[in-house]
Amino acid sequence: MVGSALGRQGDRPVGPDGPGGPDHGWFRQGTIDLRKFERYLFDPDHPQNEGKAEGWRKVFDLGPGDALAAERLIREQIDQAEIVEQEPKGRYRRWELLIPDCVGPNGNVAPLLTAWALDPDNKLPHLSTSFPRPP
């Protein structure tokens, strides 16, 4: 495993209660449920999609059947992002990581927002949503 951009704790990822808070490695190891892409982020008919599917298609030319490519894109480029903790929602701690210059498989470059949540019963976060912002 590659260490964080800050190099804290060597090659071990640092979680939210470590010195300085979570590092990129902790998010890189987090859970990304591929069904979230297929059933929500890439589905324009999902009632809560709010244009996310159109953004993925227009910016990175990704859509149904491309969940693995989207996961790879996030995991490989998450180190560019600033880690910003958000207000907790219910029992979940939350973070936003904006990848400022995400390069899609089609070569397009655009900011990509990733949002993560941590269930207190788990050790790693899960991706809650993600969508590109127009360049």
Label each region the model flagged.
Residues 87-135:
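Short, compact, well-ordered microdomains
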Residues 1-100:
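Compact soluble domain cores
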